Design a protein with these regions (language model features):
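Disulfide-bonded cysteine-rich modules in secreted/extracellular proteins
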Residues: 177-189
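Surface-exposed, low-hydrophobicity beta-strand/loop segments enriched in small/polar/acidic residues
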Residues: 1-178, 208-219, 249-276
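Extended, beta-strand-rich, solvent-exposed assembly scaffolds of outer structural proteins
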Residues: 35-37, 128, 133-134, 187-245
């Protein structure tokens, strides 16, 4: 079993930079306006509006308005009058000295969970690497202060659409879940018939097969529609690159997390038009 188990999304977490550079934890400080009326959670997308930081809902794209990812803040607590360091900005806090910490490097690589809808964990796949994804905008957790934003699992071929906010850089093998195997029977277009699945397949599940010599053969495809345990068929997003062999052993792997970066043109530092 994979460890740790990923049971809910947590926004975007910086891990390194493209080109193998190390993320040193460096952030840029921006102000949040007095009594700004929206919660901002750790891992949320943020933008600048008239010099102040605001949370921004990101689903299909932002066209050069993002300034980065929110990583906490500090402000004078209006009740205790003491400096408070917080994982998130509570909406409508009557503080005018808030400093937010933002991961603003456009080349940052982030780790994020992928969901089919809301906060339902799905799967990434090898076939998604190099492609673009949309995001799911969810309300964060005020108990932990963490974001609940997620990557949106595609139900078809991952998009090449330039307006989508996220580029997939890689899988996170440390949290991969080996779902098991089934015996291949036949395929019609992208619908695969097999022995009864002893497990459910979430959207995005990576599918491969075993060659006669025991080597793993990636299909270049993933599960398009969630399949229930006991099902004798499932649907791929497209036909496999290499046809499954007769009675081949099909191998199913769930990757609940992906490595991603902001797609080109999403970050305001790489946009010619300044924010209003």
């Amino acid at each position: 079993m994979a460890y740790p188990t990923v049971d809910s999304p947590y926004g975007l977490k910086p891990v390194n930079l493209i080109g193998g550079q190390v993320f040193a934890g460096s952030t840029r400080m921006y102000n949040i306006d007095y009594a700004y009326a929206t919660d901002i959670f750790y891992g949320d997308f943020v933008a600048l509006v008239r010099g102040n930081l605001e949370r921004i809902s990101v689903t299909s794209g932002t066209a050069g308005t993002l300034v980065g990812i929110f990583l906490g803040c500090s402000y004078t607590n209006p009740t205790t009058k003491q400096k408070q360091f917080s994982q998130y900005w509570p909406a409508s806090t009557a503080a005018g000295d808030c400093v937010a910490y933002v991961c603003d490097d456009p080349d940052t690589v982030f780790q994020a969970a992928i969901c089919s809808s809301g906060t339902t964990i799905a799967s990434g796949a090898r076939a998604m690497i190099g492609q673009n994804l949309a995001c799911l905008n969810n309300t964060g957790n005020s108990n932990t202060g963490n974001s609940k934003n997620a990557l949106a699992a595609p139900t078809d071929t991952p998009a090449t659409t330039s307006s989508l906010p996220i580029r997939v850089m890689g899988l996170v093998p440390e949290t991969a879940v080996s779902l098991g195997t089934a015996t291949y029977t036949s395929i019609s277009t992208a619908t695969v018939t097999c022995s009864a699945l002893p497990f459910a397949l979430p959207v995005g599940t990576d599918v491969g097969s075993l060659a006669a010599n025991g080597q793993y053969i990636p299909s270049g495809s993933f599960v398009d529609t969630a399949a229930s345990a006991g099902a004798t068929s499932f649907i791929l997003n497209q036909a496999p690159v290499t046809a499954f062999g007769a009675s081949a052993t099909l191998v199913f792997t769930q990757y609940p997390e992906l490595l991603v970066k902001l797609n080109f043109g999403q970050h305001e530092y790489y946009a010619g038009t300044a924010t209003a």
